[in-house]
Design a protein with these regions (language model features):
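Aromatic-lined, polymer-binding surfaces characteristic
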Residues: 1-12
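Active-site-adjacent "lid" and substrate-binding segments of diverse enzymatic cores
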Residues: 10, 18, 112
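Short beta-strand segments in beta-sandwich/barrel cores
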Residues: 12, 23, 141-143
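Phosphate/oxyanion-binding loops and surfaces in catalytic or ligand/nucleic-acid-binding neighborhoods
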Residues: 14-18, 183
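Glycine- and aromatic-rich loop/turn segments at beta-sheet edges
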Residues: 17-26
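Aromatic (Trp/Tyr) and acidic
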Residues: 30-66
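Catalytic and substrate-binding regions of extracellular carbohydrate-active enzymes
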Residues: 54-284
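Low-complexity, serine/threonine/proline-enriched polar segments
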Residues: 285-289
Length: 289
């Protein structure tokens, strides 16, 4: 059913402003200009003639030295490009599509609003403990960010490239992501093999009266705690989008909850009083990031 073509298009959809979403052990600098995707797009364009792929190729800083690549260069020079349809998508996870999903909500053009919601499977040893986490982009910029992997890539003095110890002690931990932390611990006790056995359940992905929304639940990340999260894009009357984020945790016993938001913008206003650390910064805890 054209699964390879679908895989290429889905790969492009998992990007913003030319860079891939930095989830799990992704390298933040990796993007659409990776050589593997250059070859893939050249082949797909040769098969389909989809002029919107030229829009993606224009972000790749060159074409591959093949007959297919020559056709791309020719058609780019002829001005045959049409905009690539970056769109809202639900990319189901697992071999049977039943291990959660990656939900992408978009509004506007390629540089418009994009919200990425991650109720996915663990992703084996490269997975991070960030179920029900999210990312937010707008106007071509990353607004709510993911740390990605802590790794040297192709750096010869660093043994050719390796993961740093901080990839385990920080980058993979739940606190390094935009999702709820319970009792200052990482999801599944920081054990990926345990996490691999469980996946969130996507309970909504729909558009209602112009409002795009997605929601998921997970009751296995922390013993005795059920987690739910809903994210929505709500159009503003004068243009733009409100981002609505609702997180719910339920348990029969008492717990502490922390909700980190790795925000790269400027905090202007809140509906609650803030405590300010003006003289020194201290760690929130002693372990798990």
């Amino acid at each position: 059913d054209g699964v390879l073509l679908k895989a290429v298009y889905a790969t492009v959809q998992q990007s913003y402003a030319g860079r891939f979403f930095p989830i799990n052990d992704a390298i933040r600098e990796k993007g659409l200009n990776t050589v593997e995707l250059k070859y893939a797009l050249a082949i797909v364009y040769d098969l389909t003639g989809d002029s919107s792929l030229l829009d993606v190729v224009s972000m790749q800083d060159g074409v591959v030295p093949t007959h297919e690549g020559e056709a791309l260069a020719r058609d780019l020079s002829l001005g045959l490009t049409t905009p690539f349809p970056f769109k809202s998508s639900l990319l189901r996870d697992g071999s049977n599509g039943d291990q959660g999903a990656l939900a992408i909500l978009r509004a506007g053009d390629a540089r418009g609003v994009a919200v990425v919601f991650k109720p996915t499977s663990q992703g084996l040893g490269h997975g991070h403990f960030d179920r029900l986490g999210f990312l937010y982009y707008d106007d071509g910029h990353e607004v709510v960010a993911d740390y990605g992997a802590a790794r040297f890539l192709n750096v010869e003095p660093k043994n050719g490239g390796r993961y740093l110890p901080e990839n385990e002690t920080w980058a993979k931990q739940t606190i390094a992501h935009n999702t709820l932390v319970v009792d200052q611990e990482s999801q599944f006790g920081g054990d990926w093999e345990t996490g691999q056995n469980y996946a969130p359940h996507v309970i909504a992905y729909e558009t209602v009266n112009g409002i795009q929304l997605t929601a998921a639940e997970l009751d296995t990340a922390y013993e005795g705690v059920s987690l739910q999260r809903l994210l929505a894009l709500v159009p503003q009357p004068d243009g733009g989008q409100y981002i609505v984020d609702i997180v719910r945790a339920r348990s029969d016993t008492q717990h502490t909850y922390d909700l980190p938001v790795h925000f790269k913008g400027q905090l202007i206003e809140t509906g609650f009083k803030l405590d300010h650390a003006t003289s020194q910064l201290t760690p929130f805890g002693t372990a798990n990031g």
